[in-house]
């Protein structure tokens, strides 16, 4: 499958081609935010650029629940969409970009604060459960829109409370679980090593102890996924 993104691919060394883009940037800072997001997404290995919702559904159809990908949004009001395989099929969640941050589009009736991040990768990582976290499901509820909601989850004995996230869609309340990205290309050994290192750098002090070239390489992609 050959697709063409509305964003340039060559290291983001040139400005975004506004003729290929639908959503208008609200400011120079938002432009730079999206430029940085695209650069990191292109290195992530699970950015599928211009695939459509139907194509994303086909790509994820044979994958287990929890498999996900990021693609360009087909909605002119948004830049990116998170497509995820759930226990009820593939769901597409728009990623909002406003106020200098990214967030998943949520139910406007929700009173819960929406997590916001300066990077799409950080957003994705936030919704990924820690290793060993059990999965769960809920019975159907009244219909609502296909947007995430985040009521508190029950804590396991001896553990701290964690927040669970759900998608309301087609009369169901579906747990939002991001467990494995769907790779669009083969990652280099350098990138795999970088992700591993990022996952073990839990303090700023550890980063500053690394040689300058390594710190710069890690800064270019500062996520463990």
Swiss-Prot record:
Residues 177-224 form the SOCS box domain. Keywords: Growth regulation, Phosphoprotein, SH2 domain, Signal transduction inhibitor, Ubl conjugation pathway. InterPro entries: SH2, SH2_dom_sf, SOCS3_SH2, SOCS3_SOCS_box, SOCS_box, SOCS_box-like_dom_sf. One of its GO terms (molecular function) is miRNA binding. Residues 34-45 are annotated as: Extended SH2 subdomain (ESS). Changing residue 71 to K: Little effect on LIF-induced signal transduction suppression. Loss of EPO-induced signal transduction suppression. Abolishes binding to JAK2 and EPOR. Pfam families: SH2. GO terms for cellular component: cytoplasmic side of plasma membrane; cytosol. Residues 131-160 are annotated as: Disordered. Residues 22-33 are annotated as: Kinase inhibitory region (KIR). Phosphorylated on tyrosine residues after stimulation by the cytokines, IL-2, EPO or IGF1. One of its GO terms (biological process) is placenta blood vessel development. Induction: By a subset of cytokines including EPO, leptin, LIF, IL-2, IL-3, IL-4, IGF1, growth hormone and prolactin. The keyword Phosphoprotein applies. Residues 46-142 form the SH2 domain. Low expression in lung, spleen and thymus. Expressed in Th2 but not TH1 cells. Changing residue 45 to A: Abolishes binding to EPOR. No effect on binding to JAK2. Pathway: Protein modification; protein ubiquitination. SOCS family proteins form part of a classical negative feedback system that regulates cytokine signal transduction. SOCS3 is involved in negative regulation of cytokines that signal through the JAK/STAT pathway. Inhibits cytokine signal transduction by binding to tyrosine kinase receptors including IL6ST/gp130, LIF, erythropoietin, insulin, IL12, GCSF and leptin receptors. Binding to JAK2 inhibits its kinase activity and regulates IL6 signaling. Suppresses fetal liver erythropoiesis. Regulates onset and maintenance of allergic responses mediated by T-helper type 2 cells. The ESS and SH2 domains are required for JAK phosphotyrosine binding. Further interaction with the KIR domain is necessary for signal and kinase inhibition. The SOCS box domain mediates the interaction with the Elongin BC complex, an adapter module in different E3 ubiquitin ligase complexes. Interacts with multiple activated proteins of the tyrosine kinase signaling pathway including IGF1 receptor, insulin receptor and JAK2. Binding to JAK2 is mediated through the KIR and SH2 domains to a phosphorylated tyrosine residue within the JAK2 JH1 domain. Binds specific activated tyrosine residues of the leptin, EPO, IL12, GSCF and gp130 receptors. Interaction with CSNK1E stabilizes SOCS3 protein. Component of the probable ECS(SOCS3) E3 ubiquitin-protein ligase complex which contains CUL5, RNF7/RBX2, elongin BC complex and SOCS3. Interacts with CUL5, RNF7, ELOB and ELOC. PANTHER family: PHOSPHATIDYLINOSITOL 3-KINASE REGULATORY SUBUNIT, SUPPRESSOR OF CYTOKINE SIGNALING 3. This is Suppressor of cytokine signaling 3. It comes from Mus musculus (Mouse).
């Amino acid at each position: 499958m050959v697709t063409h993104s509305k964003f340039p691919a060559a290291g983001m060394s040139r400005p975004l081609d506004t003729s290929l883009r639908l959503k208008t940037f609200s400011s120079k800072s938002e432009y730079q935010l999206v430029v940085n997001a695209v650069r990191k997404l292109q290195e992530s290995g699970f950015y599928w650029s211009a695939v459509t919702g139907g194509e994303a559904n086909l790509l994820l159809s044979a994958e287990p629940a929890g498999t996900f990908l990021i693609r360009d949004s087909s909605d002119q009001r948004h830049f990116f969409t998170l497509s995820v395989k759930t226990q009820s099929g593939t769901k597409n969640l728009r990623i909002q970009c406003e106020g200098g941050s990214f967030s998943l589009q949520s139910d406007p009736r929700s009173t819960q604060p929406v997590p916001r991040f300066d990077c799409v990768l950080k957003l994705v990582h936030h919704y990924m459960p820690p290793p060993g976290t059990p999965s769960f499901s809920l019975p159907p509820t009244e219909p609502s829109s296909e947007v995430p909601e985040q009521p508190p989850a029950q804590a396991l004995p001896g553990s701290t409370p964690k927040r669970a996230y759900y998608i309301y869609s087609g009369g169901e309340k579906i747990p939002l679980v991001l467990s494995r990205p769907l790779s669009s290309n083969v990652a280099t050994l350098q990138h795999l090593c970088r992700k591993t290192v990022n996952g073990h750098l839990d303090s700023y002090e550890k980063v500053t102890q690394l040689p300058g070239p390594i710190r710069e390489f890690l800064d270019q992609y500062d996520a463990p996924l």
